């Protein structure tokens, strides 16, 4: 069976989309190719790396990438993770489905916010898998 492609997008491809990519590569790997990107690039947030490391997922080699139109047009699903990405997401081909899963931005917030958002993203991806 050919894998589908899911593309997670947030503002800076720094926290939320990086954590979503890390979780999805673990949870959805059998059925989905997983990518993430941002409207801008802010670099991968070190606290996002640490938050994922805490649950045994290594995203330290991830890079902060701009949206790639080739990945978009070959995606089955684009998931925006913040309102900025939802509003500024490039127009999608008609065959690409889009969903918005809004999460708070943990950047600049206490460590507990990174943990909370990380865990909320995991739950959303697990719920998506069980659909």
Swiss-Prot record:
Per its UniProt record, what Pfam families does this chain match?
LMWPc
| Signal peptide range in chain numbering | none
Cellular component terms (Gene Ontology): cytoplasm
What are the disulfide bonds? Answer: 10-82, 82-89
Q: Which Gene3D superfamilies match?
A: 3.40.50.2300
Q: List keywords of the entry alphabetically.
A: Arsenical resistance, Cytoplasm, Disulfide bond, Oxidoreductase, Redox-active center
Predominantly, its location class is cytoplasm
* Example GO molecular function: arsenate reductase (thioredoxin) activity
Family in the record: Belongs to the low molecular weight phosphotyrosine protein phosphatase family. Thioredoxin-coupled ArsC subfamily.
Which PANTHER family does its entry note?
A: ARSENATE REDUCTASE
Identify this protein by name.
Answer: Arsenate reductase
**Per UniProt, what is the name of the gene that codes for the protein in this document?**
arsC
């Amino acid at each position: 069976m050919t894998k589908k492609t899911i593309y997670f997008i947030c503002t800076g491809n720094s926290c939320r989309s990086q954590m979503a990519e890390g979780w999805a590569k673990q949870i959805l790997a059998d059925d989905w190719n997983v990518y993430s990107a941002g409207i801008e690039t802010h670099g991968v947030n070190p606290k996002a790396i640490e938050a994922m490391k805490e649950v045994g997922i290594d995203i330290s080699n991830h890079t902060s990438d701009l949206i790639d139109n080739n990945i978009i047009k070959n995606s089955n699903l684009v998931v925006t993770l913040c309102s900025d990405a939802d509003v500024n997401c490039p127009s999608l081909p008609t065959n690409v489905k889009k969903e918005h899963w809004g999460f708070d931005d943990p950047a600049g917030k206490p460590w507990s916010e990174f943990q909370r958002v990380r865990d909320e993203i995991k739950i959303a991806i697990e719920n998506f898998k069980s659909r």
